Structure formats: C-alpha cells, structure tokens
Amino acid sequence: MGKKILFILSVFISANAFSQVNGEAEPPHISMDSLFKIKEKESIGKLFPQFNSTFNGRIITKDSLRGKVVFINFWFAACPPCIAEMSALNELYKKFSSNKNFEFISFTYESPARIILLKKKYSIKYKVASVTRQECYRLNQNNGFPTSIVLDREGVIHDLFTGGDIEDKKEAKDFIISMVYKSINGAIMKQ
C-alpha cells in the first residue's frame, strides 16, 4: 500500500514539475463555450424528454407533436440574451407558423401572470408555457439560458443552441437567421 502511495505521489510531482514554465504552473483552460459545445454534441440524436404543458389553454405533450418539426426555446425575463433574441424569435415564428408540419413553443419559469405582461411588453407571438425552474433545466438538458432546441418529426434532438453571451439584438438576429433558421429548414426538408 505504501509503495502505491509513493508511486502516485512521485507521478503527481513529476507531472507537476514538467507542466511548469518559468517556475509557474498554468492550469488547463477550458472555456464555458467549449463545454456547452460538448454538451450540444452529446444531446444531438437523443430523444427529447416527455413533457405535458398547457399553452394558451391547450395541453401539448411531446407525443402530440410527433410528425412535426418542433422549435423549443427556453428563457426567463432577467436574462439579457433571452430578451435580446425575442424580436428575432418573433420573426422566426412568423416565417414558419403557416407550415402545418412545424410547431414553435417556449418554456419559462416565469409565472403565468408575468408571462402575459412579458408577451405584451416584447410582442411575443409564439406559445409560452410556465413550468418550474427544475422542469426548465430538465427539458433544456441542464443548459443555461437561452437555450433553443430543434426536434425532428420523431421527437429526436436535431440541433441544440445555447446562448448566454449575445446581448445585442442585431447579433442575436444574425445568429438566429444564420444558424437556427438553417437547422429548422434542414429538419423540415429531411423526410
């Protein structure tokens, strides 16, 4: 047992000595963005979890959306990047809302009364459901906010986009048009 501890300790000391430059050790740097990209890749191709929520008085479940491409957005009011993308999301909704094979929904942990005020304030046109914070995280794969997910017709995650650093409306719009629009279009065109 003592030899194992001595061996592990010597490996640790050697590794530490070799990792130093000019006497200063530098810890490995992993950005949050790269962690989100890893999580995004892990989620793509997996079934989206079951849910049962009320949107505008209508109960919607994952199973009730089968056969449609679904865009799901997760947000909350105190999130500047979430607010920055709302105008672009309204445009996205307008672009695809007439397609009977497409559904646009969003989840927030804001109260139903607050949702009514926010929909008016930001002219939100798409469906918004109030769920618990825990449910938001469960459904958005434990990502931050905003998170947008595109599901294919079978309820499989086709694409996942995590935000957080875009607070400018134009940047948010450019991102949504360049990435999200293409993803939705690709999922719709895929048979």
Predicted segment positions?
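Thiol-/selenol-based redox modules, centered on thioredoxin-like
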Residues: 150-191
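Bacterial Sec-dependent N-terminal signal peptides
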Residues: 1-24
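Structural microenvironment flanking redox-active thiols in thiol-disulfide oxidoreductases
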Residues: 83-122, 133-138
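N-proximal helix/coil linker or "cap" segments that precede and/or mark the start of modular domains
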Residues: 20-50
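Short pre-active-site segment immediately N-terminal to redox-active cysteine/selenocysteine motifs
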Residues: 68-70, 75-78, 111, 144
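A short beta-strand-turn-helix
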Residues: 49-70
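Short, internal strand/loop/helix patches
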Residues: 105, 116-154, 162
